[in-house]
From Swiss-Prot:
Family: Belongs to the GAGE family.
Gene: XAGE5
Origin: domain of life: Eukaryota
Location of region: Disordered: 20-108
InterPro entries, sorted: GAGE (IPR031320), GAGE_fam (IPR008625)
Native organism: Homo sapiens (Human)
Bias-annotated ranges (Basic and acidic residues): 40-52, 94-108
Name the UniProt record assigns to this protein: X antigen family member 5
Length: 108
């Protein structure tokens, strides 16, 4: 008796397209059509073009001032802690006694 290996049977319940999702066809980028120049390409150093004027008007915001303003608005009081917080010392965690079973408030 000769041994026969298992024959390959494709699964019928799931298709590859269902596992992976819809296949995208590779797209070939179309060459972009350049617009014919309306003015001559010659640019003399003394002349300004319309494109150059827009670049000169861009302003960089002051990042340091913005960061300082944000940090002050998040912390609240600029001079430090408020008077009701100053002078209070938090108890150490070793001084707390937790009640049995985790019910109730911790005792000091």
């Amino acid at each position: 008796m000769s041994w026969r290996g298992r024959r390959y049977r494709p699964r019928r319940c799931l298709r590859l397209a269902q596992l992976v999702g819809p296949m995208l066809e590779p797209s070939v980028p179309e060459p972009q059509q350049e617009e014919p120049p309306t003015e001559s390409q010659d640019h003399t150093p003394g002349q300004k073009r319309e494109d150059d004027q827009g670049a000169a008007e861009i302003q960089v915001p002051n990042l340091e001032a913005d960061l300082q303003e944000l940090s002050q608005s998040k912390t609240g009081d600029e001079c430090g802690d408020s008077p009701d917080v100053q002078g209070k010392i938090l108890p150490k965690s070793e001084q707390f006694k937790m009640p049995e079973g985790g019910e109730g408030k911790p005792q000091l």
